[in-house]
Amino acid sequence: MQLLKQLKWYFIQEYKNYTIAIFLLISISILQLYPPKLIGMLIDISIRKQTQKAPILPLILIILFISIIIYILRYMWRLFLFGASYKLAIKLRIEIYNYLCQQKNDFYLKHKTGDLIARITNDVDKVVFAAGEGVLTLVDSLIMGVSVIIVMITQISWKLTIISLIPMPIMAIIIKRFGKKLYSSYHDAQTTFSHLNNYAQENLNNIHMIKAFGLENYYSKKFLKIAHKTRKKNIKIAKIDSKFNPIIHLFISISHLLAITIGSYMITYNEISTGELMSFILYLGLIIWPMLAFAWMFNIIERGSASWDRIKSMINNNLFIHKKKYKNISNIPGILEVKINYFKYSKSNKTILKNINFKIRPGQILGICGPTGSGKSTLLKLIQRQIELYDGKISYHSIPITQFNIVEWRKKMSIVNQTTFLFSDTIANNIKLGKPYASQKEIEQATTFSDLHNDIMTFPQGYNTQVGERGIMLSGGQKQRISIARALLLKSEILILDNALSSVDNKTEINILENLKTWKKNKNTIIMCTHRLSSLINSDLIIVIENGSITQIGKHKLLIQNLKQWYGKTYLHQKLSNH
């Protein structure tokens, strides 16, 4: 029942639908009380042989009319109740998706993709089922059960009612004990399902590697092992589940046996009529649903509770919380200042960055270089707030970037990574991904800056040429230039190029770098991280990072003078290699 309390906010939000549904359920419960009474009257009339005088046909028509009304009302409550619960599914998934979009890399290191998919699909379904079927069974079982018992006591015999319901408290105690077992079993089964889902997702993503190394059988066996584990967990649930209905039917049968035995005895002493006993047995039959529903409700609620706890453990109770107030970011390009005292990843003891201090003004180009694994990519992630800095400060306009809304902060930046991603769409649509309503003139201006326009005009359909699986195959350099054009189109205040020119030739690289000089005249800041030091010649400031620390800082002309240090030595080596 704790789950229903935790979903109170949603029941209040959808109170109209739930109120109408509950009202209809109450109406149905009341209407269902009449047919057994009327059938008992018909039986007594038949036994007394008063069929000619008694209104048998009207009684039959009343029973038929009530049945039709009940059918219509059942249809209507389904629309209101399940309509409301399905809205919960949409709301939960949107909120969870938005929450996931705002998380940083640390979050995705803790939670695997398959597990997240399982929680946003399978677990949400279980919670929604509890908000729909769970509420139905709770309300219907209580109202129907109480109503029938009241009628049995007041209209037929209180003695017969008490004797017939003796097995019910025992059944309730047993159901409660099963509920606790079900909760832990469902939680374990959902966790195992998440592992299975995640394993399948990882294997499908890397199927080309599995095939390349001939590891199909090996990974199939591992998958089978996890599938068997999932099967065992579900069988455990099925075993507990399978005891529910037999126990309920056993106690219902005992109730019927007591009713018929004691009722027959009461007929002989004229305490009740045969028709009343038949009505009583029919009423007892109406209690079967509340009993089954009550047990089923525990089943549904425990499933939903286990799933809700899994969702909460993922979001750390941060869903639907009041959003923090952030400072506004000026639309005027500002100074970006980085002061990193110390940084390491949460699951590692290794220091990634330390004593990183630099400042870059609007319109300047910052070059970042250094050996592989020195911390360059981590620095870029910290600036983008993909990961959070705990010891130090990164400021823009002299305001720490943590005080800005993360979405608004990222809108200030355009990022081009070494690994490019293109949709199966036209070249134009791929370029205007971040600015869907960009004009053709704006697109062509961006491709001119990225030295791609002439290449595109050689394609059969120009900017409308399809790329991807069903289109033409582009070279690595062309893909990178589409990504650069996509970023330049946004005209963001900060442009981050992370090895973005690694696949282009020297001539194209020179053209792009010259074009960027023109592009940044609007005071755009460029941060360029690269292994190719020739790309940094025109940088206003270059920092060399080795083992997480800045070992050299200055302009290109200054840094190449010292051939004993990394920058001068590497630049000379690359220059000789090119020749």
Curated annotation (Swiss-Prot):
Pfam families: ABC_membrane, ABC_tran. ATP binds at G370, P371, T372, G373, S374, G375, K376, S377. SUPFAM superfamilies: ABC transporter transmembrane region, P-loop containing nucleoside triphosphate hydrolases. Keywords: ATP-binding, Cell membrane, Membrane, Nucleotide-binding, Translocase, Transmembrane, Transmembrane helix, Transport. One of its GO terms (cellular component) is plasma membrane. Residues 18-303 form the ABC transmembrane type-1 domain. SMART domains: AAA. The keyword Translocase applies. PANTHER family: ATP-BINDING CASSETTE SUB-FAMILY B MEMBER 10, MITOCHONDRIAL, ATP-DEPENDENT PERMEASE MDL1, MITOCHONDRIAL. Its EC number is 7.6.2.2. It comes from Buchnera aphidicola subsp. Baizongia pistaciae (strain Bp). The keyword Membrane applies. This is Multidrug resistance-like ATP-binding protein MdlA. It is found in: Cell membrane.
